[in-house]
Amino acid sequence: MTAMTNIYETTIIGGGPAGLYAAFQAGLYGLNGQLLEGDQQFGGKVATYAERVIHDIGGMPNITGQDLIQNLTAQAAFYDTPLRTQTLVTDVKYLADQDYYQIDTPDDRYYSQTLILAMGGGVVRPKQLRLFEEQTFENVHYAPANPEDYRDQRVVLIGPGYNLMELAPHLLATAKSVVWLTTKRPFVDEAAEKAFLTAYPQIDYYCQPLASYQQVDQQVTSITLADQTQITFDQAVVSLGYRRSLQTLDQWQLSAEQIEERPDIWVIGNQIPDRAGISLLTSAFQDGITAVTEIVAQLKPTAKTPMVTTHNPVFQADTKAYWQERLR
C-alpha cells in the first residue's frame, strides 16, 4: 500500500469494545476507516474473562464477554470496514508536509488522516506457566473457552484465577472429568473453599506445587504433583493472570505530546487517563461516538447526520432477518 493508492479517513488502533464500536460508528457515518488489532483475536481485556457474565451494560441485564465480543465484531463488520487482527502497530509518525499519519506494522504500511487510539492498557498477554518453560502445546489453553469445546474430555484447570472458579462448574456438564490444580488458594478463606468444594464434589482439587510434566509430541499428557500424584488429562486450561503492555506505543515516533495536543487524534476507552476510577463499557461506547462525530465535522463539515438506525434503510435486510428469526 502506498500513500497514493489509499489514505484512510480514520484508523482505529485497538480492537477491544471501544475500538469495535468506534468502527461501527465510522461505517454508520460514512467514513473510510480501518481497525488494527495486534492480538490474534478481538476483545481486548474482555477476552480475558470471556466466559464471565457482564451485568452493567444498559439494556443488557446479562451477557458473557464472549457473546459481547461476537456481537460487537459482527456490528463493526456491518459496513465492510477492514478489521485486521494480528496487525501490531510498531510505529506511527505524523507526516507534516502531507498532513496525514504513516502507520507501520510488521507486514504493511498504512496512511490515515486521523487516528482513534483505543488501546486500553495495551496488548494483553496471558502469564505463562513456568513449568512448561514457555513451550507451546496443542492442548494447553491460556484463554478459557466455551465449556462445549471440552465435551467428553478430561480437563485439568491450572492456576488460582477467578476465571477457573467460574469455568469449573460449567465444565461438569460437558467434560468427562475436571481436576483443578493450584499452588495458591483462590478462595477468600477456608469457609469459602469448603463451600465451593461441597457444592461441586465432582471437581478433584489439589493445592500443591507442580513438580513435572509428561508429553507426547506436542501435547502434555500428564502432570506430576509434589506428592507424586500423577494427573492425566486431554486438555489443560491455565489462568495465572495477564500482562498488559503499551510498550509499542512508547516506541512510536508519534510523541505523547502530539497524542495529547494534535486535533486529529482521539483517545477513547480505558486509554483515557484520569477517569476517576470509572471503568464502564458504556463509557467506551460513548467515547467512540464522540470521536467519530468530531472527525466527520472536521473532514466533512457539510455531511448530513445519518438517519437513526431504526429507520435507516441500510438496516432493512438486517431488520427483516431479525424479525424472521424472532417469529419462528
From Swiss-Prot:
| Reaction catalysed by this enzyme | 2 reduced [2Fe-2S]-[ferredoxin] + NADP(+) + H(+) = 2 oxidized [2Fe-2S]-[ferredoxin] + NADPH
Q: Name one GO molecular function term.
A: ferredoxin-NADP+ reductase activity
- What Enzyme Commission number(s) apply to this enzyme? 1.18.1.2
How the cofactor binds, per note?
Binds 1 FAD per subunit.
One of its Pfam families is Pyr_redox_2
Which InterPro entries does this one have?
A: FAD/NAD-bd_sf, FAD/NAD-binding_dom, Fd--NADP_Rdtase_type_2, Ferredoxin-NADP_redctase_2
Record-linked PANTHER family? THIOREDOXIN REDUCTASE 1-RELATED-RELATED
The family this protein is said to belong to: Belongs to the ferredoxin--NADP reductase type 2 family.
Query: What interactions and quaternary structure are annotated?
Result: Homodimer.
- Name-wise, this protein is Ferredoxin--NADP reductase 1
Please name the source species: Latilactobacillus sakei subsp. sakei (strain 23K)
Q: What is the lineage of its organism?
A: Bacteria, Bacillati, Bacillota, Bacilli, Lactobacillales
